């Protein structure tokens, strides 16, 4: 058990086992953090970083307790991330390379380039496998350390490196359907959409249309309203920020190919995000039911859209977009059915997979990629 005296001595043995919240700053740290130590009455200990976040504390930019302890290495112009097992960078790239008209990242020579924004600064990353690690390279002028490590945190969340999927794999090995998928796609992680506005907007864009056309609309939307970085002879786009869309009109969005209803719903969402009525921070502090009900209050957000966002952004393991057409097609193929399963069929099947619905869905989606 970490004592205040051990905290003062900066004992690193407790790093990752205990997280220290500082009431006066609203920051949580590792016990070994080199920052000035607060007085005893201003310290609160948390067993997990998630509890620290739920307590209203944000990650320290000196010790970065949000990153996996002992699994990241800042090398100046690059950052290396030691990946947890099981993990397959190749499988993740396979999923991310499904559509040739994807506009938010570029994959070439088993490397992925992506532009992100951290604290208002645009950064261009190249991510590649390096032995058992993932290496992040910064292609525009190298940012300072806090930005580099915030970029590493983004990649960890994007590739779901914070999650321990061992329990899912152990469960799947005993299941007649899932065991084939985890063996075939071993190491695949549930690729996320870390930004809440992007996740919900993308889900709204994709409602009731096929994925190929949805990607075309997304590209129109991004290149009309988003920012871009140039490197070499290529442009790298960032998803539009909520503030930019909140300042747009319905007719502006219709011009990129969206329906009037979808345009209205996306602008409403952008206003809610801009004023802070809905945020990722608020939602992840809720349980599944509370977050689900909050999302359903947004115009244009039904069961599928809510669960899609909860699965890919909020990381609820039980999120299940039960009406998803791709999910139904995957189940038809895996179960060798003559026709697609009904909603009740899907619900009955997933009742056997309680607590693993999100990962089961993602692996079934993966099975659709030739």
List the predicted regions and their residue ranges.
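HhH-family (HhH-GPD) DNA N-glycosylase catalytic core used in base-excision repair
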Residues: 1-370
């Amino acid at each position: 058990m970490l004592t205040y005296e051990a905290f003062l001595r900066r004992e690193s043995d407790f790093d990752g086992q205990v997280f220290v919240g500082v009431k006066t700053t609203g920051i949580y740290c590792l016990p070994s953090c080199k920052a000035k130590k607060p007085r005893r009455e201003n310290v609160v200990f948390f067993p997990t970083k998630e509890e620290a976040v739920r307590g209203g504390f944000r990650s320290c930019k000196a010790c970065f307790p949000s990153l996996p302890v002992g699994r990241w290495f800042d090398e100046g112009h690059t950052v290396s991330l030691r990946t947890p097992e099981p993990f397959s960078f190749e499988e993740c790239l396979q999923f991310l390379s499904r559509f040739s008209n994807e506009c938010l990242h570029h994959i070439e020579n088993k490397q992925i380039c992506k532009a992100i924004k951290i604290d208002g600064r645009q950064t261009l990353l190249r991510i590649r496998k390096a032995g058992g690690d993932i290496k992040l390279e910064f292609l525009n002028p190298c940012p300072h350390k806090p930005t580099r490590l915030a970029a590493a945190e983004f990649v960890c969340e994007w590739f779901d490196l914070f999650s321990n999927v061992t329990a899912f794999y152990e469960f799947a090995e005993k299941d007649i359907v899932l065991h084939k998928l985890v063996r075939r796609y071993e190491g695949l992680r549930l690729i996320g959409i870390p930004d809440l506005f992007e996740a919900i907007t993308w889900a709204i864009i994709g409602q009731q249309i096929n994925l190929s056309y949805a990607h075309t609309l997304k590209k129109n939307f991004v290149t009309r309203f988003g920012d871009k970085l140039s490197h070499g002879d290529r442009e790298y786009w960032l998803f539009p920020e909520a503030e930019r869309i909140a300042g747009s009109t319905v007719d502006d969005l219709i011009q990129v190919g969206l329906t009037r209803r979808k345009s209205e719903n996306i602008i409403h969402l952008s206003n809610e995000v801009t004023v802070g009525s809905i945020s990722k921070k608020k939602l992840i502090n809720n349980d599944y039911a509370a977050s689900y009900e909050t999302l359903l209050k947004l115009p244009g957000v039904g069961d599928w859209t809510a669960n899609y966002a909860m699965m890919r952004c909020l990381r609820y393991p039980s999120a299940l977009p039960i009406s998803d057409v791709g999910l139904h097609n995957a189940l038809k193929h895996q179960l060798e059915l003559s026709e697609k399963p009904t909603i009740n069929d899907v619900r009955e099947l997933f009742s056997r997979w309680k607590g693993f619905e999100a990962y089961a869905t993602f692996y079934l989606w993966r099975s659709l990629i030739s």
